[in-house]
C-alpha cells in the first residue's frame, strides 16, 4: 500500500523526495523492508527516502544507511533526555551507544549536519541531567572526527520545555514557571563550548 501511494505521489507531483511520516516511523516493525522496497523502486530516478525524526534504537544505523542511498539529508534524532536516570523515569529504553553508533554511521556516510531533540523541565530533573544534554550533543559532534571525516560535525540540539499532560504519570506535576525556563535556557547556552554545536531552546 505504501508503495502504491508513493508511486501515485511521484507520478502526480514529480517531487524527488518521499517522506515516511508518523509519530515514530523508525519503530515500524517492517521499516527496513519498506525502505528497501522504496529504494529499489525509486533509486534510479534519484528519488530519496526521508523521515522527519528517528527514535534512537538498535536499528538506527541501518535506517540512516538506507536514507543515504540517493542523497544526504540532515539527520534528526530524538534522544529526548541525556541520562539513564531520566530515561528510567520516563520509561524510554534508549542506549547511548545506539545514538553514538548511529551518529558515527551517519557522518561516515557523508551527512553534514545533525539535529537532536531533547526536553527540559521533566519532574526530578537535576543539573547533571541538563548538563548531559550539552555533553551528548558535543559527543555526537565529535563522532564525525572519530569516523575519520575531518573536523567536528555540525549539531543543533533543540530543547523544548516539558508540558505535563492529562492521563499520564506526570499529570499532577506543575509546569515549570517562565522564570525557571528563562534561567535554564541561559544555563544551557553558558555550558556550550563548541562552535560546531548550537543549543536551540
Each PLM stretch: what is its role?
Residues 1:
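Canonical Radical SAM [4Fe-4S] cluster-binding loop centered on the CxxxCxxC motif
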Residues 4-115, 120-154:
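Conserved SAM/AdoMet-binding glycine-rich loop
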Residues 11, 122, 130-201:
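Auxiliary Fe-S-binding modules of radical SAM enzymes
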Amino acid at each position: 500500500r505504501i508503495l502504491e501511494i508513493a508511486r501515485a505521489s511521484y507520478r502526480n507531483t514529480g517531487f524527488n523526495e518521499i517522506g515516511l511520516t508518523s509519530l515514530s516511523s523508525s519503530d515500524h516493525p517492517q521499516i527496513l523492508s519498506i525502505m528497501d522496497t522504496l529504494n529499489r523502486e525509486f533509486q534510479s530516478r534519484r528519488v530519496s527516502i526521508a523521515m522527519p525524526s528517528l527514535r534512537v534504537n538498535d536499528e538506527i544505523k541501518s535506517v540512516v544507511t538506507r536514507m543515504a542511498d540517493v542523497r544526504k539529508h540532515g539527520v534528526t534524532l530524538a534522544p529526548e533526555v541525556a541520562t539513564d536516570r531520566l530515561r528510567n523515569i520516563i520509561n524510554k529504553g534508549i542506549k547511548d551507544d545506539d545514538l553514538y553508533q548511529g551518529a558515527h554511521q551517519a557522518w561516515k556516510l557523508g551527512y553534514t549536519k545533525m539535529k537532536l531533540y531533547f526536553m527540559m523541565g521533566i519532574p526530578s530533573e537535576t543539573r547533571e541531567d541538563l548538563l548531559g544534554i550539552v555533553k551528548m550533543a558535543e559527543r555526537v559532534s565529535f563522532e564525525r572526527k572519530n569516523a575519520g571525516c575531518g573536523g567536528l560535525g555540525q549539531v543543533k540540539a533543540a530543547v523544548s520545555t516539558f508540558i505535563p499532560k492529562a492521563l499520564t504519570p506526570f499529570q499532577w506535576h506543575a509546569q515549570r514557571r517562565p522564570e525557571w525556563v528563562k534561567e535554564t535556557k541561559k544555563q544551557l547556552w553558558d555550558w556550550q563550548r563548541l562552535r560546531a554545536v548550537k543549543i536551540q531552546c
